[in-house]
Structures are given as C-alpha cells and as structure tokens.
C-alpha cells in the first residue's frame, strides 16, 4: 500500500471519528506504521455536511494550508489540511522539499 493511500485512509477514518467542537480548530496526529503524521482540522460554526481535504505543496503543511482550512470553515465546510511527509520530516529548503516529495513519487503503484 502506498504512503498516500495509507494517509488518506487514516485521515478519512479520523475525520469520521474525531470529535472537535463546532467553530474550533485542532491539530491532530495519527500513526501509520512507525511514522507519525499530523493534520489540521477546522470546524465550521454549524454542522458541516461536506469535508474538504487540503493537500500541501512541496514545502509541507504550514501556515498557508492552515489559513485556507480556517477560511473554508468560515464558509461552512469542515476542512482538513493533511501532512504527507510526517512530523519528523526536516524541511529547511529546496533540497529537503525535493527529498520528501521524491519519497512520495517513488512510492506509487504502477
């Protein structure tokens, strides 16, 4: 199973079972194998009927994705900004971005 598929399955399960109060935001963590990942969940003020998943750019989950999740929650959506690299990923520049993105590209099924 690919990393991305495992992450998506885990986050869909978390999104279905994680209880976060309406109008609140929370950084959650989850485990796949030996790796720990995080996701930022932004809940709207009223019950959301739709969840939007935000996939980060090659520089990882950061303030940009978090701000977009909050904006979507203000529009009435439950927004989940995913981390595809894991909490231990070191992202200090282009070489790091290339390395972590390469891991995802090399982990795809044919």
Predicted features and spans:
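Serine-hydrolase catalytic machinery in alpha/beta-hydrolase-like enzymes
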Residues: 27-110
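Bacterial N-terminal signal peptides that target proteins for export
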Residues: 1-8
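N-terminal signal peptide c-region/cleavage motif recognized by signal peptidases
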Residues: 16-18
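Boundary of Sec targeting at the N-terminus
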Residues: 22-24
């Amino acid at each position: 199973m690919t990393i991305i598929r495992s992450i998506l399955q885990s986050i869909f399960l978390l999104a279905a079972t994680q209880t976060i109060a309406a109008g609140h935001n929370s950084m959650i963590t989850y485990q796949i194998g030996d790796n720990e990942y995080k996701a930022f969940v932004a809940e709207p003020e009223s019950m959301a009927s739709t969840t939007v998943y935000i996939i980060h750019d090659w520089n990882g989950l950061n303030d940009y994705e978090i701000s977009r999740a909050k904006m979507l929650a203000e529009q009435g959506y439950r927004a989940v900004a995913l981390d595809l690299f894991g909490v231990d990923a070191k992202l200090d520049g282009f070489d790091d971005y290339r390395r972590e993105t390469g891991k995802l590209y090399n982990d795809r099924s044919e």
